[in-house]
């Protein structure tokens, strides 16, 4: 599945559940929440959680958690992009161009 197909799948999936209709500021809150969960997953991978009320997970379990949380972030980014009719391909090209212009080698 390429990026455009995945973006369309996310759009359809969220639409079918009515999740795309949420106010954009609620969606931004979800994105912030998921970003925090990415930070927590990275902490578990890098330094551990060291909490007596949580079981210690293996590296692979922690890595899989990070994969899932990155997916949640990406899903929220796609919903926001879809709301404003922005393809991820457009985002990729724009970001690449911005970085290339800003940090071009002389």
Regions found by a protein language model. Name each.
Residues 1-70, 74-106:
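Flexible "arm" and connector segments at domain edges
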